[in-house]
């Protein structure tokens, strides 16, 4: 466990955040406590409420969402040679904590032979996913039988609730909890005199191990920034001069000319054969582009600056980073 003394900055200009306590209670329970100061009266509550909602509702997680086996007649049946009922096995699979960056649906498998215990380490996963706690229990095989279960893995946010219509062909949906943050609280400490009251915001974050509290804090902050960016662009896109009927649109980026020149420069190269996963892009940017059906550098350069900024969770800094990578090609 790491704990630091809280030092209050006397400056009213520079806000600083700091991790003042960090500990790992188990493989599936991380804790972190952070401070942000100095803040004016009322600002701590504004930030604290927004951060808590973003931490609990905006972050994505990876979960097992479906299990399939042709030998299972229904969810509440039992199988000879397995101590747990099918329902109990599904509940155990629901508790498996996964860490990974993936887009869409991926398949995984459990293939085990009894007698013995089946744990999370027996799950065969795609390369982009890993298990946080390999010791998590799945089933107990009491006889020399083969247990083969097909699994479906997805990345999403919030809750995934199963519905009766999703039961078919020996396939059983699993109620998924995609939230990597188990809990988040904020508290406020006031200091200073009545004329110059200031606040310190304390944030406490508990995660399931798929993210550290610090990673969760960074991701929630980025998501909040992305949510507010459209409000900044609206004025820039629709600026009207008082004595002129023509719209004047401010450029999105000062470096748009670089994008135009780069497109011309690369015209002779077979960009359609260079895929974006060869360009050393960070996972978040890569996933944003894939979701928008941008698979090659040619796809990317055929998008205008406006098109790129319409991509969900995409930021101006991401375009700068992409340009830097492309100019090296």
Swiss-Prot record:
Keywords: Chloroplast, DNA-directed RNA polymerase, Nucleotidyltransferase, Plastid, Transcription, Transferase
Region annotated Alpha N-terminal domain (alpha-NTD), chain positions: 1-235
The organism of origin for this protein: Gossypium hirsutum (Upland cotton)
Family (UniProt): Belongs to the RNA polymerase alpha chain family.
GO cellular component: chloroplast; DNA-directed RNA polymerase complex; mitochondrion
Role played: DNA-dependent RNA polymerase catalyzes the transcription of DNA into RNA using the four ribonucleoside triphosphates as substrates.
Location of the protein in the cell: Plastid, Chloroplast
Reaction equation(s) it catalyzes: RNA(n) + a ribonucleoside 5'-triphosphate = RNA(n+1) + diphosphate
The protein's name in its UniProt record: DNA-directed RNA polymerase subunit alpha
A Pfam family: RNA_pol_L
Free-text comment about domains: The N-terminal domain is essential for RNAP assembly and basal transcription, whereas the C-terminal domain is involved in interaction with transcriptional regulators and with upstream promoter elements.
Entry annotated with the keyword Cell membrane: no
Domain of life: Eukaryota
């Amino acid at each position: 466990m790491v704990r630091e003394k809280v030092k209050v900055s006397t400056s009213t200009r520079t806000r600083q955040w700091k991790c003042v306590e960090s500990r790992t209670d188990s493989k599936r329970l991380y804790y972190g406590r952070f401070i942000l100061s100095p803040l004016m009266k009322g600002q701590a509550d504004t930030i604290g409420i927004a951060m808590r909602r973003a931490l609990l509702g905006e972050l994505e997680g990876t979960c097992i969402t479906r299990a399939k086996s042709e030998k299972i007649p229904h969810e509440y049946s039992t199988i000879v040679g397995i101590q747990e009922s099918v329902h109990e096995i599904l509940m155990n699979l629901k508790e498996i904590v996964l860490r990974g960056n993936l887009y869409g649906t991926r398949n995984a498998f459990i293939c085990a032979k009894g007698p013995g215990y089946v744990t999370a380490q027996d799950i065969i996963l795609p390369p982009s996913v890993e298990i946080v706690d390999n010791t998590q229990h799945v089933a107990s095989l009491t006889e020399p039988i083969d247990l083969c279960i097909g699994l479906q893995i997805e990345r999403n946010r919030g809750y995934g609730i199963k519905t009766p219509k999703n039961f078919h062909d020996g396939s059983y949906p699993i109620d998924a909890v995609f939230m990597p943050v188990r809990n988040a609280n904020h508290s406020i400490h006031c200091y200073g005199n009545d004329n110059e009251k200031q606040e310190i915001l304390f944030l406490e974050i508990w995660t399931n191990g798929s993210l550290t509290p610090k990673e969760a804090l960074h991701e929630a902050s980025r998501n909040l920034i992305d949510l507010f960016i459209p409000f900044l662009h609206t004025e820039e896109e629709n600026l009207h001069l008082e004595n002129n009927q023509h719209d004047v649109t401010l450029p999105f980026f000062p470096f748009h000319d670089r994008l135009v020149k780069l497109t011309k420069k690369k015209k002779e190269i077979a960009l359609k054969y260079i895929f974006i996963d060869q360009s050393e892009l960070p996972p978040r940017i890569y996933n944003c582009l894939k979701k928008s059906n941008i698979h090659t550098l040619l796809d990317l350069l055929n998008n205008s600056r406006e098109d790129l900024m319409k991509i969900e969770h995409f930021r101006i800094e991401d375009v700068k980073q992409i340009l830097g990578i492309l100019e090296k090609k």
